[in-house]
């Protein structure tokens, strides 16, 4: 079993989490290991298109302590989060129960009271 929290959970089942989560989710799927995300779906995030990924300064990966670690021609991008598609997620564990990622809209229809 592989589990993680999520910084953002869109209603279409896409999640945003720290860099590396997408790669681990791919490996989990490949090796048949279930991946469960813990968190509360974001009501205003209907799809992956609503997830904004902050881009960090690429110089942070092109140098170490101000010393370049690559040739000047190399360019980089440095996103702060990965987006994981729902087909890699076995379920989303919420305060109202476990949901299939493709059915997260049902979370907002549920009459179960929140625990917080």
Predicted regions, residues:
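Conserved phosphate- and dinucleotide-binding cores of soluble alpha/beta proteins
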Residues: 1-116
């Amino acid at each position: 079993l592989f589990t993680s929290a999520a910084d953002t959970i869109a209603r279409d089942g896409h999640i945003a989490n720290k860099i590396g989560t997408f790669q681990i989710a791919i490996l989990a799927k490949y090796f048949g290991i279930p991946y469960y995300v813990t968190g509360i779906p974001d009501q205003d995030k209907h799809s992956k298109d609503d997830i904004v990924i902050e881009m960090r300064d690429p110089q942070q990966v092109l140098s170490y302590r101000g010393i370049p670690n690559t040739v000047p021609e190399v360019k980089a991008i440095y996103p702060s989060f990965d987006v994981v598609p729902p087909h890699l997620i076995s379920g989303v564990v919420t305060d109202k129960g476990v949901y299939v990622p493709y059915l997260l809209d049902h979370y907002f229809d549920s009459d179960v009271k929140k625990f917080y």
